[in-house]
């Protein structure tokens, strides 16, 4: 299966859980956060659940053992994922669901890519300038020397590119267009 097919599949399942959650979105969100933390702490449990040779019945037993922390709707949803042999995608689906829930609550995470590590004051200026979008719940600073200077901010599916590299790339493109114009008119 291609990466875009995986992404579409993950998004489809996440959207279904989001819509099924309805008025219980906050509760389901907390349960999903608990489950993701559990799988992070107990990695071997997720490896077991995502293994294709483990039967549906065994996977169901494991999920029912942690059922006291999860609502019936979430357990049923996870059982559908297992029944459809998509258990290896469970974490991605749950993370995508959280992304949809945050978007619904007007919360988002941002990643700031810069040529060198930004100072807290610089990060604060950037986050304050983006506060009109909603509540920023997490900021990460990724260092990428290839952007030469400035920064690139990614939030959700959006990108703000204020890097020196992109500026120079645009300048090169404009120069090429001008050269072509001159050649065509001379």
UniProtKB/Swiss-Prot annotation:
Q: Where in the cell is it found?
A: Cell inner membrane
Write down the membrane topology. Answer: Peripheral membrane protein
Which keywords appear in this protein's UniProt record, sorted alphabetically? ATP synthesis, Cell inner membrane, Cell membrane, CF(1), Hydrogen ion transport, Ion transport, Membrane, Transport
Q: In which domain of life is the source organism classified?
A: Bacteria
Pfam families attached to this UniProt entry: OSCP
Q: List the Gene Ontology MF annotations in alphabetical order.
A: proton-transporting ATP synthase activity, rotational mechanism
Which family does the entry's similarity section mention?
A: Belongs to the ATPase delta chain family.
Record function comment: F(1)F(0) ATP synthase produces ATP from ADP in the presence of a proton or sodium gradient. F-type ATPases consist of two structural domains, F(1) containing the extramembraneous catalytic core and F(0) containing the membrane proton channel, linked together by a central stalk and a peripheral stalk. During catalysis, ATP synthesis in the catalytic domain of F(1) is coupled via a rotary mechanism of the central stalk subunits to proton translocation.
Name this protein carries in UniProt? ATP synthase subunit delta
Species, as recorded = Wolbachia sp. subsp. Drosophila simulans (strain wRi)
Q: Which gene encodes it?
A: atpH
